[in-house]
Amino acid sequence: AAMRVPQDAKPDFIFVTTKSYDTANAMIALRAFADRAIFVTLQNGLGNAETIARTARRVVAGTTAHGVTFAGPGEVRHAGVGETMIGAWSRVGESDLVRLRDLLADVGIVASVTSDIRTELWSKLVVNASINPIAALAEVPNGRIVRDKRLLGVLEAVCREATAVAKAEGARVDEDELRHRTILVAKRTAANRASMLQDLDRHHRTEIDAITGSIVTAAERHQIPVPLNASLYALVRAREAAFRVASA
């Protein structure tokens, strides 16, 4: 990983790994490579690939369900194995995707290539929105959500709302399959403290806008009621606002 990149570097791939709200600023620093490298995003939420593609010519979008826990500055702990998917977003060919897949395999990350990355992004968004805000507000690791019947009921209802929005947006998703996938991800990352929970623990800004906010915005566009997602969005934003007031 690099925070500063020599302007004469010639990377084949650049992975943008910032929080979603920092993507635009990251691309300002990386614009010298816009025509030289293939940019890769596995970030949470929607909108990252679009933001990157406004600067970079070639973009790969993807999703991953690997769980990671922040241990300290410059130190993270791998807390769960999950599926990784990659697909072409802008001016990327099959050979580029295969090369990236093989590169990831070399470092122990098994990735699959998909021809429908937009559906995968929406699927990951539904999973994320069904786990992250609940874990953050209940202050529990992912596994507790599926062991607690009350929290599991909330997860299933949030997932149901979000899936309806994903379908309206054109994603080829199935409600039962996504519910099963969400529960499986929570079990596989049972010990992981969701990124949104880690952010709130440190009184940092969360990615609620790119995750649940994307669902609420799309739901309004399609006039689909999503009361639970809207409530979770409002509650997490309220927690963020409380931190800002306390630090003022």
Provide a role label for each language-model segment.
Residues 156-248:
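NAD(P)-dependent Rossmann-like dehydrogenase/reductase catalytic/cofactor-binding core
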Residues 12-15, 121, 132, 196, ...:
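A generic hydrophobic-helix recognition signal that picks specific residues
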Residues 20-21, 91, 116, 202-205:
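Short, surface-exposed acidic/glycine-rich loop or hinge patches that mediate macromolecular interfaces
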Residues 11, 23, 48-49, 97-100, ...:
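A general structural signal for well-ordered alpha-helical segments in protein cores
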Residues 32-33, 51-58, 62, 74-175:
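Internal alpha-helical scaffold of NAD(P)-dependent oxidoreductase catalytic cores
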Residues 1-75:
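Rossmann-like NAD(P)(H) cofactor-binding subdomain of soluble oxidoreductases
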